[in-house]
Regions:
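Membrane-embedded alpha-helical bundles of multi-pass transporters/translocases
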Residues: 4-166
Length: 166
């Protein structure tokens, strides 16, 4: 049985669908819902979280595929190095995001422990929570769309690796 028969959808297609779902819900929340109606925001955000979870699972499964790709390209199997590199980039992005959040909070006059925040601060928080992820998700969709790695390509890599091992 070939790999293509075991999977109904491509990983990258599911990743793009999940990412598109959270991008669309983020844009709906920002431009239509707003933050005044909590229950409507929570209801719409639920669909975004489903998409975000789907994209996250697919991203991790595609990271595992890079191990075979790396072995196919270089002849060396480097699970540890690839996983460590991914964790490093992930932590680097978390650090950058924290720095960016601080810059935005500072530029929108955020007041710590204040019960009421200014409209600029609330809008800055809303942009940080919905527009930035929508932009990042759109970039991820574009990059993934042009990625040639699909089940046919993976099947070719996997069969060539099996031939090398035998």
């Amino acid at each position: 049985m070939c790999i293509r028969d075991r999977h109904r959808f491509e990983k990258k297609t599911l990743f793009m669908i999940g990412t598109f779902l959270y991008v669309i819900t983020d844009l709906i929340i920002y431009y239509i819902t707003g933050y005044e109606n909590f229950w409507l925001l929570a209801f719409i955000a639920t669909f975004g979280f489903i998409g975000f979870g789907m994209a996250g699972v697919m991203a991790w499964s595609m990271i595992a595929d890079t191990i075979e790709y790396g072995e196919w390209k270089s002849g060396f199997r480097a699970e540890g190095v690839l996983n460590a590199a991914h964790v490093f980039v992930f932590k680097l992005s978390v650090g950058f995001s924290a720095w960016l959040a601080g810059v935005i909070l500072e530029s929108t006059d955020y007041v710590a422990n204040a019960i009421d925040q200014s409209p600029e601060t609330l809008n800055g928080l809303f942009i940080m929570g919905y527009i930035f992820p929508a932009v990042a998700g759109t970039i991820a969709i574009i990059v993934t769309y042009f990625n040639k790695y699909d089940s046919n390509f993976y099947e070719r890599i996997f069969s060539e690796l099996k031939q090398r091992q035998s």
